[in-house]
Curated annotation (Swiss-Prot):
SUPFAM superfamilies named among the record's database cross-references: Aconitase iron-sulfur domain
Protein name: 3-isopropylmalate dehydratase large subunit
Subunit structure: Heterodimer of LeuC and LeuD.
Organism field: Buchnera aphidicola subsp. Uroleucon helianthicola
Any GO BP annotation: L-leucine biosynthetic process
Key words of the record: 4Fe-4S, Amino-acid biosynthesis, Branched-chain amino acid biosynthesis, Iron, Iron-sulfur, Leucine biosynthesis, Lyase, Metal-binding, Plasmid
An example Gene Ontology molecular-function term: 4 iron, 4 sulfur cluster binding
PROSITE patterns assigned to the protein according to its UniProt record, in alphabetical order: ACONITASE_1, ACONITASE_2
InterPro entries, alphabetized: 3-IsopropMal_deHydase_lsu, Acnase/IPM_dHydase_lsu_aba_1/3, Acoase/IPM_deHydtase_lsu_aba, Aconitase_4Fe-4S_BS, Aconitase_4Fe-4S_dom, IPM_dehydratase_rel_enz, IPMI_cat
A Pfam family it matches: Aconitase
Cofactor: [4Fe-4S] cluster
Amino acid sequence: MSKTLYQKIYDSHIVYEDKKNISVLYIDLHLIHEVTSPQAFDSLRNKKRKVRQPEKTFATMDHNVSTQKRDINASGSMAKKQMQQLIRNCDEFNISLYDINNPNQGIVHVIAPEKGMTLPGMIIVCGDSHTSTHGAFGALSFGIGTSEVEHVLATQTLKQQCFKNMKVEIVGDIPKFVTAKDIILFIIRRLGSSGGSGYVIEFCGNVIEKMSMEERMTVCNMAIEMGAKSGIIAPDETTYAYLKNKIYSPSGACWEXSISYWKTLKSDKDAFFDKCFTIDISNLAPQVTWGTSPDQVISINEKIPHYNEFNSITQKNSAKSALKYMGLNEGAYLTNISIDKVFIGSCTNARIEDLRSASKILKNRKISSNVKAIVVPGSGSVKQQAEREGLDKIFINSGFEWRLPGCSMCLGMNRDQLNIGERCASXSNRNFEGRQGRGGRT
């Protein structure tokens, strides 16, 4: 029987399947952080359970950490408590932790790929919605809730249903100045914020084949913004080259055996997909969101739409509400709207290639004195590499602040936030109301 890539990975991890097609799946890698794990560990203690496979569990601090100084007190009492609990939990249950004093600390979805923890064919889970990032490697990866975090810690398995398959083929020649972020924003605009609901989306096509691993991670990272369970891309030579010689990657004879297996991880030619889309990006311009949903997107040279231009009542009401919250008028150009802050960072766009691209634009230029701008590398390793290349100096000389790794302004959960009414041009993944701080406009 022909299978999609998703079906191959799903089926190979079934431990038990009931008559209602609900499966117990084996989990290869469990990523945890300070926010969604404390209650799970408390429940383990109360039930006198152990972590079943601590060697397949990895932790870091990222959501709450200060990006200005390495001080556990710097983000407030709640953040301090959560970080202290993570240290205690990892020590008690023998889990590897990159805490704020570890030079490699950073965003969990940046660290795992760059260290070679993320491998093709794995099932990877984390108490974070953007776990779909790891799908760029041909892994099945998705976010889970706190009760599920406890279940995986205790059993190294998870109960799941099989989702539908969607194929999004991206074709054409990538125009100048268009990035992977532009491409995925355009796809979200086309398919809608719920267009992927109930599906695992496989991205393919000549555009994907030309992308670097970091670009593919950006695409899969934002599959969740279409409502998808996850996004996934079949591994290829680009994948293997990226993983070779990483700290946690296979080596020696194991490397060759792994390559042989990874080459089987692709959808069969006649595999069935429940939905298929082909999207040509040859004429695409840079994309930017104007509203409060990731599908409220326009090209940089387009006018902000009128809410009556949308088809459904729900879309009209959403657009009307977004225009009011954002303080924007239909028919205006976003290029004429002033901004207060700029954020370069997040698990979507805080890798070394992202920083290189931004630094090229900023070299020998100065930002407005009225704008506060920060760059937050995705990990200690990214920060160190950027500094070796002198990128930090380019950012600082242009007027940006060069920060320490963390989730930072992607979410209003630390000291990096917008004030009420402030506008931010952000490289992150969500533009919800209050996402970057109460009353902030992303």
